[in-house]
Amino acid sequence: MPDAVKVGFVLFATPARGTLIVFCDDGLKFGATATKALGAAVATVKRAAATAQFKGKSGSALDLLAPEGLKVGRLIVVGAGKAASINDYDLLKLGGAVAGKIGAGDTAVTVVADLPTGAMKPEQAAAIASGIRLRAYKFDRYKTKKKDDENGAANASVTLAVADPAAAKKAFTPDSHVVDGVILARELVNEPPNVLYPEEFAKRAAQLKKLGVEVQILDVKAMTQLKMGALLGVSQGSAHPGRTVIMRWNGGKKGEQPLAFVGKGVCFDTGGISIKPSASMEDMKGDMGGAACVVGLMHALAARKAKVNAVGAIGLVENMPDGNAQRPGDIVTSMSGQTIEIINTDAEGRLVLADVLWYVAQKHKPKFMVDLATLTGAIMVALGTEYAGLFSNNDQLAERLAAVGQSTGEKVWRMPLGPEYDKQIDSQFADMKNTGSRNGGSITAAQFLQRFVDGTPWAHLDIAGTAMASPKNEINQSWGSGYGVRLLNQLVAEYYEAKK
């Protein structure tokens, strides 16, 4: 993984160098270990806090030259807010706040993992460590000249002082694999499209074999034999042929129905013949955020040896305006046998998903399918960049996704489905058309997808506002967010994974 920050756990011992970080609540109270670490400097710190009007608000920080009596060079006090009601996502954000204060010169950092309410539990310390890693990630491999202050926490060695280092490390191990999955998803979204085209994306997904994931790559010949006309129609205008990648993790009981996750992977989307405006078209390298999430999730499940059977499937294409490109007015036949009239070639993601969803439903008979796609601008109009749109034909699955969305901070908002919307995608010439009117655009897109799930319990996550170019936050300073990896990992762990 590209992040170089090192995070470890030790019993507390007063650090003799580097940077010391402690937490306080919104009453400027410290935990017992932090109080011990500060010693006589507590009074000095509180005077400095009063002068700076530092109140201990969650995520805020007071940065000081270490007071007399401390051997470290720098002291940072990070506010934990109302410590008595802190949850795992709050702790993740606190870890991000810690990483955000680490500078390029902070090579040795000690974080005292306690609160006024007591020493952090192993799982809480692990959440802090995960937040540090998530915030420290940055994508700069193509920069040949880097400023000295750009690295921040990326090259730091961070030690968390905890009550039980072995237990904290044990708790952090699976969490760290999930962070790896998030970072992998971010890497894929951030890559330029001349580097990450369908064949290259497929090769990177195939690297999951090292973790025990079975990987099958369907090329154009194989997809033609399967009659994936909807997906192939999108890719026919590109010099880079399309691919479908099927990833299988068999961590559950033999023969048990798998869980299925499907991702839209448009590696670059010009809009095709219905070409997009040039302004911000460069952002369309991220139109494969759904596929990136699925690869990151499969990495997380395999690396932490999840006790579940899971299938990840991604359809990879480029949507280009070549002389061979698909035209408005074309009619394609999907793998399901249903015909689709192309009205707008820029409504291509649903065509890709149509064939991959049908393939997974037919070949793997999953317990449920969740697809992720940067599908519509309409969902951004409706929900902005804080929530993904959730559409589902199954109330239990939708409720579970909403619950883990709240606990992980990767929030979803359920949107309606209904046959009343189908008339917008009725076609005079085919079974359906690939887009309706502007009204309810994200809903009609989901109605379209529902025609290809063959009755399987299914949820569609429209992540157009959350996967890329979303506002930076406490745990992500990257253009690509890796949205969905933590959400779906938690869904699996909480509701479907065999308990030890």
UniProtKB/Swiss-Prot annotation:
Task: Give the record's GO biological process terms.
Answer: proteolysis
Tell me the SUPFAM superfamilies matching this sequence. Answer: Macro domain-like, Zn-dependent exopeptidases
Q: Where in the cell is it found?
A: Cytoplasm
Query: Which prosthetic group or cofactor does it need?
Result: Mn(2+)
Mind telling me which HAMAP family this protein's record contains?
Cytosol_peptidase_M17
Known InterPro entries for this protein?
Leucine_aapep/pepB (IPR011356), Macro_dom-like (IPR043472), Peptidase_M17_C (IPR000819), Peptidase_M17_leu_NH2_pept (IPR023042), Peptidase_M17_N (IPR008283)
Any binding details for the cofactor? Answer: Binds 2 manganese ions per subunit.
Q: Name one GO molecular function term.
A: metalloaminopeptidase activity
Where do the annotations place Mn(2+) 1 binding? 269, 346, 348
- Physiological role: Presumably involved in the processing and regular turnover of intracellular proteins. Catalyzes the removal of unsubstituted N-terminal amino acids from various peptides.
One Pfam family from the UniProt entry?
Answer: Peptidase_M17_N
Q: What is its EC number?
A: 3.4.11.1, 3.4.11.10
Which EC class, in a word?
A: hydrolase
Keywords from UniProt, A to Z, are: Aminopeptidase, Cytoplasm, Hydrolase, Manganese, Metal-binding, Protease
- List the GO terms this entry assigns under cellular component, sorted alphabetically: cytoplasm
PANTHER family from the entry?
A: CYTOSOL AMINOPEPTIDASE, LEUCINE AMINOPEPTIDASE-RELATED
Name of the featured protein: Probable cytosol aminopeptidase
Q: Taxonomically, which superkingdom?
A: Bacteria
| Family named by the database record | Belongs to the peptidase M17 family.
Q: In which residues is Mn(2+) 2 bound?
A: 264, 269, 287, 348
Instruction: Please write the reaction equations for the catalytic activity of this protein.
Output: Release of an N-terminal amino acid, Xaa-|-Yaa-, in which Xaa is preferably Leu, but may be other amino acids including Pro although not Arg or Lys, and Yaa may be Pro. Amino acid amides and methyl esters are also readily hydrolyzed, but rates on arylamides are exceedingly low; Release of an N-terminal amino acid, preferentially leucine, but not glutamic or aspartic acids
The UniProt entry annotates the active site at: 276, 350
Query: Per its UniProt record, what NCBIfam families does this chain match?
Result: PRK00913.1-2, PRK00913.1-4, PRK00913.2-2, PRK00913.2-4, PRK00913.3-5
